[in-house]
Amino acid sequence: MTQKEQGQGFIEVICGPMFAGKTESLIQRRNKALKLKKKILSFKPRIDDRYSVKEEIVSHNRNNIPAILIDKSKDILTFITPEINVVIIDESQFLDNDIIAIVDYLANCNIEVIISGLELDFCGKPFGPMPYLLAIADTVTKLTSICAISGGKANRTQRLIEGKPAQSNEPVVLVGGKEYHEPRCRKHHCLADIDKTKVNWKNFANQSK
């Protein structure tokens, strides 16, 4: 695909913990672009089936927009045509690392790329391709939620298994809503097997090498 003569591409990343309104913000940006008569494609990973298995992006408030379900990042390229102005991608943390090169390419083709996702997993570690997407983004919007314990600003996602904090060795991906997750601030975010008063070498072993 050749670069468009008009318009300027960019990458915007909307991130934050669960229940921060990331998908809602994504839907708002899509609707604004639609009013400007822009040609839009929306995508989400097929694995995200919390609220719908249909071809749509659904927020916690149950607002929705049409979307194409993808199994891998390269699937996006098969749908891109010269008239597309805007590409929207929800739940980007679930995608493979090819998404980094793909969104960079799309932005260089003068396409506006708007992405949402969790930048931290339930352990508080960088999640999937999100740290790289944040690094190459032209604009970053970091949203917060309300801590379920203190009522303060929450920037982390607490995983709960039968109402108790999860162990750090549990699978990173656990698709679900309030039955498994709640927003928490740094102070109240915890893991059952991690002592936060000590340097957390175990949790960040791969990142510190």
Curated annotation (Swiss-Prot):
NCBIfam families: PRK04296.1-1. Keywords: ATP-binding, Cytoplasm, DNA synthesis, Kinase, Nucleotide-binding, Transferase. Its EC number is 2.7.1.21. The keyword Kinase applies. Belongs to the thymidine kinase family. It is found in: Cytoplasm. The active site is at E91. GO terms for biological process: DNA biosynthetic process; thymidine metabolic process. It catalyses: thymidine + ATP = dTMP + ADP + H(+). It comes from Aster yellows witches'-broom phytoplasma (strain AYWB). Homotetramer. Its main location: cytoplasm. HAMAP family: Thymidine_kinase. InterPro entries: P-loop_NTPase (IPR027417), Thymidine_kinase (IPR001267). It comes from the Bacteria. It is an enzyme of class 2 (transferase). This is Thymidine kinase. Disulfide bonds: none annotated. GO terms for molecular function: ATP binding; thymidine kinase activity. ATP binds at G16, P17, M18, F19, A20, G21, K22, T23, D90, E91, S92, Q93. GO terms for cellular component: cytosol.
